[in-house]
């Protein structure tokens, strides 16, 4: 029973942190403010997380688990190259849209002034997503014998940059300009250009 309560409190702390990141854009979250939001003392926060960095790591673990597991499902369920790319980008954009506070962690905005390893971990996550996109694009060349005009690594970088740009706009607009807005039309254009190359 005690373990269940502990997990529940940890999750509650992370949910409050994500909520504060959403409702206080551009502001740094202190442990004092977070403790007040959770309704506990700062000491109680530290019983569940040894540091504020560990709290952010908890959010990053949630991001990694959510995105990477779903990307694996996309890879298993879908075989078409362009559809795979579309679904991976759409997943990233929808995840950011549905988790506005957490999108600030993805963007790095919420990590300014925090431990460098947090930014490195988010950067590594984007590196994994870019590698996955590159692999998807390379498989098209192997399957069909025809590649793209640009190197797959450059294309993967470009596709991920589009998604990262949409997330940055979402944060800059204080969550008003949805990252998925017009994505289907924009993807249609991008896909057409890729297939013509």
Curated annotation (Swiss-Prot):
Q: Which PANTHER family match?
A: ACREF/ENVCD OPERON REPRESSOR-RELATED, ACREF_ENVCD OPERON REPRESSOR-RELATED
Reported function? Required for nucleoid occlusion (NO) phenomenon, which prevents Z-ring formation and cell division over the nucleoid. Acts as a DNA-associated cell division inhibitor that binds simultaneously chromosomal DNA and FtsZ, and disrupts the assembly of FtsZ polymers. SlmA-DNA-binding sequences (SBS) are dispersed on non-Ter regions of the chromosome, preventing FtsZ polymerization at these regions.
- Any single GO BP term: cell division
Instruction: Please tell me where this protein is predominantly located.
Output: cytoplasm
Family the UniProt entry places it in: Belongs to the nucleoid occlusion factor SlmA family.
Name the Pfam families on file: SlmA-like_C, TetR_N
Quaternary structure note? Homodimer. Interacts with FtsZ.
In which compartments does the protein localize? Cytoplasm, Nucleoid
SUPFAM superfamilies attached here? Answer: Homeodomain-like (SSF46689)
Keywords from the named record: Cell cycle, Cell division, Cytoplasm, DNA-binding
**GN (gene name):** slmA
Residue ranges forming the DNA-binding region read 30-49
A single GO molecular-function term is: sequence-specific DNA binding
Superkingdom to which the source organism belongs: Bacteria
What's an example GO cellular component term for this entry?
cytoplasm
Please state every residue range assigned to the domain named HTH tetR-type.
7-67
Which named protein is this? Nucleoid occlusion factor SlmA
């Amino acid at each position: 029973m005690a373990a269940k309560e502990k997990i529940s409190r940890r999750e509650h702390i992370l949910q409050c942190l994500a909520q504060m990141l959403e409702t206080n854009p551009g502001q740094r979250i202190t442990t004092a403010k977070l403790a007040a939001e959770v309704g506990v003392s700062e000491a109680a926060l530290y019983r569940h997380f040894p540091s504020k960095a560990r709290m952010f790591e908890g959010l990053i673990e949630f991001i990694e688990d959510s995105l990477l597991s779903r990307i694996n499902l996309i890879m298993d369920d879908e075989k078409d190259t362009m559809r795979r790319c579309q679904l991976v980008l759409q997943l990233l954009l929808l995840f950011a849209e549905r988790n506005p506070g957490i999108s600030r962690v993805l963007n790095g905005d919420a990590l300014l002034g925090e431990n460098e390893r947090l930014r490195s971990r988010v950067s590594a996550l984007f590196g994994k997503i870019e590698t996955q996109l590159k692999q998807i694009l390379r498989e098209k060349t192997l399957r069909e014998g025809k590649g793209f005009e640009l190197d797959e690594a450059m294309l993967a970088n470009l596709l991920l940059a589009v998604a990262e740009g949409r997330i940055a706009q979402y944060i800059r607009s204080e969550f008003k300009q949805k990252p998925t807005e017009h994505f289907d039309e924009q993807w249609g254009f991008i896909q057409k250009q890729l297939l013509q190359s």
